Amino acid sequence: NASTMLNQSKNVYQAEIDSACELIDFFNFNCQYMQEIYQQQPPYSPKGMWNMVQYRPLEGFVFAVTPFNFTSIAGNLPTAPALMGNVVLWKPASSSVYSGYYLMQMFKEAGLPDGVINFLPGSGGQVGNPVLDSEHLAGIHFTGSTAVFQGMWEKIGGNIAKYKTYPRIVGETGGKDFII
């Protein structure tokens, strides 16, 4: 919570909700969703056959790009694909490296093996361009601006022929809706 307060100028109540409470909720929900996915099997197998679904990680890595203003989302975007067996390259927003760094230390202390989530702070171009150019890009997990996400889509579209698989792309952008 303290790193969120310092890094994102949140008060103690905002930081508690943002970094600790909601991240714990994400972890609980993600574990439940993972169990539900793995339990989904075809309801019928003909005699002498066994119909089954096998889930496996993507072939390559997932690029998690996290926002500047929400520590729990910054913790969720790299951990959700890692929980499903994927290797993740995590690029935090340049202005949220401090809280992201402490999340990464927490993951390591909890036993996350080296190389599962790889913390890559840096500018969007320095980190993003080589990642999006890699033939091993298998997925994007993004929260941030619409313009950045559109730029990523454009670059992926231009690179589509060189990727080993079609990248799966998940993004949340421009959450500026009003509430009445």
Residue ranges: model-predicted function:
Residues 1-38:
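Glycine-rich loop-to-alpha-helix module at the N-terminal edge of alpha/beta enzyme cores
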